């Protein structure tokens, strides 16, 4: 899995342990995700060479990583793709796409949790069809299953905060962090 980098930074590990606490308030969840994202932003951009780069947060939870990435890449365009996972089939449904006609050479995708990999696959496919040649997918937490699915894909790199070994019947990571979008924004299912 040469295209996958998993953070070994102790601060990232500590913050992910805090994020697993389901009693955190939404403001605390956002703060922890932002802190982890700062480290992942530096890690994911340290070898960036292309002058043509965009940031693509996956709506809505990917927005929680934007502050950190826009500080590291302050003048790159930010495009949005909205995808949700249908609850019964776990299939990704795209509901919003604000990519311009001309692609950037490199896109940095932000999505804090990669569970089944369905959303990741949908976004990667969309960006490849758009013409993007290099993709860096950044996630706070991912499943082993999803990372295995994406190992050694040419032109796609993954930078991950930590890896959980399994998924539950609803497609959530175990032990995971719950529905990160709901936790970030105080929504209830």
UniProtKB/Swiss-Prot annotation:
InterPro entries recorded: PRibTrfase_dom (IPR000836), PRTase-like (IPR029057), UPRTase/APRTase (IPR050054)
Entry's cofactor comment: Binds 1 Mg(2+) ion per subunit. The magnesium is bound as Mg-PRPP.
Keyword Nucleus belongs to the record: yes
Enzyme Commission no: 2.4.2.9
Keyword GTP-binding: yes
Cofactor field: Mg(2+)
Control of this protein's activity: Allosterically activated by GTP.
Top-level EC class: transferase
GO molecular function, one term: uracil phosphoribosyltransferase activity
Gene Ontology CC annotation, any one: nucleus
Pathway, per record: Pyrimidine metabolism; UMP biosynthesis via salvage pathway; UMP from uracil: step 1/1
Superkingdom, taxonomy of origin: Eukaryota
Pfam families: UPRTase
Family note: Belongs to the UPRTase family.
Protein name per Swiss-Prot or TrEMBL: Putative uracil phosphoribosyltransferase urg2
């Amino acid at each position: 899995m040469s295209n996958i980098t998993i953070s070994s930074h102790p601060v990232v590990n500590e913050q992910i342990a805090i994020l697993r606490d389901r009693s955190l308030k939404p403001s605390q969840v956002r703060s922890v995700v932002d802190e982890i994202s700062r480290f992942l932003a530096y890690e994911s951009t340290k070898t960036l060479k292309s002058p043509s780069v965009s940031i693509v947060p996956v709506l809505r939870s990917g927005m929680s990583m934007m502050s950190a990435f826009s500080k590291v890449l302050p003048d790159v365009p930010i495009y949005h793709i909205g995808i949700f996972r249908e609850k019964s089939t776990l299939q990704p449904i795209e509901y919003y796409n604000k990519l311009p006609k001309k692609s950037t050479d490199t896109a940095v995708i932000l999505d804090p949790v990669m569970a089944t990999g369905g959303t990741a696959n949908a976004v990667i496919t969309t960006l490849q069809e758009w013409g993007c040649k290099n993709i860096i997918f950044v996630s706070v937490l991912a499943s082993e299953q999803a990372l295995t699915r994406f190992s050694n894909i040419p032109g796609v790199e993954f930078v991950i905060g930590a890896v959980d070994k399994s998924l539950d019947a609803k497609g959530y990571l175990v032990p995971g962090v719950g529905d990160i979008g709901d936790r970030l924004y105080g929504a209830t299912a």
